[in-house]
Amino acid sequence: MGKKRTKGKTVPIDDSSESLEPVCRHIRKGLEQGNLKKALVNVEWNICQDCKTDNKVKDKSEEETEENPSVWLCLKCGHQGCGRNSQEQHALKHYMKPRSEPHCLVLSLDNWSVWCYLCDDEVHYCNSNRLGQVVDYVRKQAGNTTPESAEDNGNIELENKKLEKESKNEQEREKKENMARENPSMNSTSQITVKGLSNLGNTCFFNAVMQNLSQTPVLRELLKEVKMSGTIVKIEPPDLALTEPLEINLEPPGPLTLAMSQFLNEMQETKKGIVTPRELFSQVCKKAVRFKGYQQQDSQELLRYLLDGMRAEEHQRVSKGILKAFDNSTEKVDEELKNKVKEYEKKKSVPSFVDRIFGGELTSTIMCDECRTVSLVHESFLDLSLPVLDDQSGKKSINDKNLKKTMEDEDKDSEEEKDNDSYLKERNDIPSGTSKHLQKKAKKQAKKQAKNQRRQQKIQGKVLHLNDVYAIDHPEDNECEVEMSLQREADIKSNHISQEEVAPKEYCVNQKDLNGHEKMIESITDNQKSTEEAAMKNVSVDNDLEVLASSATECPRNLNGAYLKEGSNGEVDISSGFENLNLNAALQPDEINIEILDDDPTPGTKVYEVVNEDPETAFCTLANREAFNTDECSVQHCLYQFTRNEKLRDANKLLCEVCTRRQYSGPKANMKGERKHIYTNAKKQMLISLAPPVLTLHFKRFQQAGFNLRKVNKHIKFPEILDLAPFCTLKCKNVAEEHTRVLYSLYGVVEHSGTMRSGHYTAYAKTRTASTHLSNLVLHGDIPQDFEMESTKGQWFHISDTHVQAVPTTKVLSSQAYLLFYERIL
């Protein structure tokens, strides 16, 4: 007995020492060597038993014979059935039959790989001596059996027919290849085949995204143009006196772009059934180190890093081309050369291939209720992150209301004690897991620090009053605190919290970051400079910015240190002293592009501009948006919530410069020059003003609940044909006149199954003929005028790493979508 125990203990150690791959737990129950040897006596190899009994082998069409579905051998009973890629899927049906013991282990008779249906993963039989011996035995039996040993003449005739059909199919393939060589245009518009992708180690998040990008033919077309050597681009001069545009010669694309092009070509042209995207993934890891280490990652973040990385390489190509063009001329002064290069970089009108395919534009419209002045701000996007509300959101909103009430009561008490105090009004998201006791304790500590701060200000004798960051207010008393009104614009990029889950809060002279720590905003005098940096980690807040001014003024999100200059009349001028202070160091520069406004705002700066817009039509859309069922959990409802009309009231009022100028202009102006800012009620809405050729939608299923992250598993309905017109502005740029529909066709889905800690990403991709409308829109800018039905037809496939299976459309629409890929058809 002792020997048996020691032997039983050493077996798992030996198995685990062979490889780091986990051993399948179902080998013992799913493997029956005795039954298998009996079943393999005088057996016909590579023929599905069920198809043979149904007389479907002899009636196969030429197309089905050409596909030649793989046959899987059950290691429990020796049953041979066609794989899941076939039409009948007899091997899978054999496993699904109810039995006392599972028939879960199957062996592929094509490549001799073992698959476990229960684990839904490949089993490496080198890890198990018993499984390896069985596979070797089966291979020997299959090798010893020859067609001559078959006594049935019908089988020989069947094999002869197969050989004849295969020869005919080879001749047809050669004809098709010759036709494709003669007509390269036909080859470009043909359907892209679906191939599996090798898992490099928890890289299913990467494989699922790449499967959908590989089914984007226009991306492959543009990458061919990018790779062309000697590409010359013309850039209009920034100075009107110069009439000739600058011609620049672009360098070869960057390593990430080249790896992407190589991957797409391999997916299209290789004859292998499985592609290993090792080079592309390594280039992504070089751009974003966070994806190293073979950990579970987020598919949407991977997509953003990939697109941003390729776009940055394209911008770098143009910048280097401009610099080389000036180096070849007679320019010698370095300072002048730098200034000219910067001017041309601002003027450059060469959008990258990423923006041409995935780029769209959002327009935020805000209107003052008093003067009805309309102002706009434009912001580009590569994807839209849509909020997903679940049943727990109602409970959280109730807790937020109670928390808000207690915070407002404390603020009222502090106002009675300090008449001249000003408050930092900031919309912030308080984790629901934080207790009220901790909130009150932190509040008291902040008040004590504020008292000490005011004492220091009395000693110094000079007090600075910051009113909404950019304007100066004369302090009536020496006991004034910093007043800042920070407002955040909705982040249409990745990972942000829903607007429903954010309630306005007021804090007394403190700023609270997402980790729950409070940092005081120190008073700044002419003898000291201070910078306060609030780091936002892991989660970015998507609170809506209250607009500080409707006429080309906005509170900066990036203020890197405040420098003060004392005026001649004793006032402190800070309007020209703010530089970029990064309040969100975790985000990339491309993701948030709000800077302080000066006299010469740079391109890309997010500026609210006053426009002569009719207030009656400023918030109109291309199509009626009131026909949606608000109770329905669908992608249309998520878009409706994302673009819903908001009212700025109470603490979220608009600081209107037009109303302020009207109030304090003329004889009403104060002799001392003092002017109080006028806050008014306003209306705000964000709509799509440029519909992208390829629309990418992201459902924010991963949300923060207290100090933890959770996943929302609610099913969201999404259609095959999506009309984006109810969410577009009335003057949408790339929509034909008098068109009231902006139609998109679904061609890709990324699904996340499982939980936050142990989940799996798979892809649904549709093979179809390439859309001529989409190619003309991206390549030539031609707006589609009519509906193209052919682009909506195709075959859906479900891809889980290396395994590809044809599925019906109903299964795609019932999946738990995380990313949706739509292409423009009208």
UniProtKB/Swiss-Prot annotation:
Q: Which GO terms describe its molecular function?
A: cysteine-type deubiquitinase activity; cysteine-type endopeptidase activity; histone binding; histone H2A deubiquitinase activity; ribosomal small subunit binding; transcription coactivator activity; ubiquitin binding; zinc ion binding
Q: Note the CDD domains from the entry.
A: Peptidase_C19K (cd02667)
Biased amino acid composition, Basic and acidic residues:
158-180, 393-407, 420-429
From the UniProt record, list the coiled-coil ranges: none
* Subunit architecture: Homotetramer. Associates with late pre-40S ribosomes. Interacts with CEP78; promoting deubiquitination of tektins.
Q: What class of enzyme is it?
A: hydrolase
Primary location class: nucleus
The domain comment in this protein's record states: The UBP-type zinc finger binds 3 zinc ions that form a pair of cross-braced ring fingers encapsulated within a third zinc finger in the primary structure. It recognizes the C-terminal tail of free ubiquitin.
In this chain, Zn(2+) 1 is annotated as bound at: 24, 26, 116, 119
Could you tell me what this protein does?
Answer: Specifically deubiquitinates 'Lys-120' of histone H2A (H2AK119Ub), a specific tag for epigenetic transcriptional repression, thereby acting as a coactivator. Deubiquitination of histone H2A is a prerequisite for subsequent phosphorylation at 'Ser-11' of histone H3 (H3S10ph), and is required for chromosome segregation when cells enter into mitosis. In resting B- and T-lymphocytes, phosphorylation by AURKB leads to enhance its activity, thereby maintaining transcription in resting lymphocytes. Regulates Hox gene expression via histone H2A deubiquitination. Prefers nucleosomal substrates.
Q: What is this protein called?
A: Ubiquitin carboxyl-terminal hydrolase 16
Q: Provide one Gene Ontology cellular component.
A: nucleus
Catalyzed chemical reaction(s): Thiol-dependent hydrolysis of ester, thioester, amide, peptide and isopeptide bonds formed by the C-terminal Gly of ubiquitin (a 76-residue protein attached to proteins as an intracellular targeting signal)
EC assignment: the record states 3.4.19.12
Alphabetized, the UniProt keywords read:
Activator, Cell cycle, Cell division, Chromatin regulator, Hydrolase, Isopeptide bond, Metal-binding, Mitosis, Nucleus, Phosphoprotein, Protease, Thiol protease, Transcription, Transcription regulation, Ubl conjugation, Ubl conjugation pathway, Zinc, Zinc-finger
**Residues in cross-link Glycyl lysine isopeptide (Lys-Gly) (interchain with G-Cter in SUMO2):** 140
PTM text: Phosphorylated at the onset of mitosis and dephosphorylated during the metaphase/anaphase transition. Phosphorylation by AURKB enhances the deubiquitinase activity.
Record family assignment: Belongs to the peptidase C19 family. USP16 subfamily.
Active site per UniProt = 204, 760
Zn finger limits (UBP-type): 22-142
For binding Zn(2+) 2, which residues are annotated in this chain's numbering? 48, 51, 82, 90
Biological process (GO) annotations held by this record are: cell division; mitotic nuclear division; monoubiquitinated protein deubiquitination; positive regulation of DNA-templated transcription; positive regulation of ribosome biogenesis; positive regulation of transcription by RNA polymerase II; protein homotetramerization; proteolysis
Q: Which domain of life is it from?
A: Eukaryota
